């Protein structure tokens, strides 16, 4: 596995409202250009970019894990991957850990995932 300098920030959400993200993650979203979102809630998350953000966003609607992994591997700069709840408990976390080094990944489970 070749390690890259860019980070993949995996953000678990429990709401489609941008304002429900902690301020740290709102800032991360503002600063990151490339965003991957599951196809099932792509339009809701894409609407976050209408919040007077300075940086234009490039969104990727992931329809399959294979397609998503290929897209993530092609990215040269930091990316955000939106998931539901806690991505390490169930979902995409395991697949990411099989394809990327731990140093490339940062996980931010949703607040309700701690309950």
Annotate the PLM regions.
Residues 1-115:
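Class I S-adenosyl-L-methionine
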């Amino acid at each position: 596995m070749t390690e890259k300098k860019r980070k993949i920030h995996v953000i678990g959400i429990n709401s489609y409202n941008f304002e429900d993200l902690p301020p740290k993650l709102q800032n991360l979203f503002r600063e990151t250009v490339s965003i991957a979102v599951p196809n099932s809630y792509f339009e809701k998350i894409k609407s976050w970019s209408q919040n007077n953000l300075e940086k234009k966003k490039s969104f990727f609607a992931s329809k399959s894990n294979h397609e998503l992994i290929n897209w993530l591997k092609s990215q040269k700069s930091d990316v955000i991957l939106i998931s539901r709840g806690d991505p390490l408990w169930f979902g995409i976390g395991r697949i990411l850990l099989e394809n990327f080094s731990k140093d490339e990944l940062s996980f931010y489970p949703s607040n309700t995932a701690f309950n």
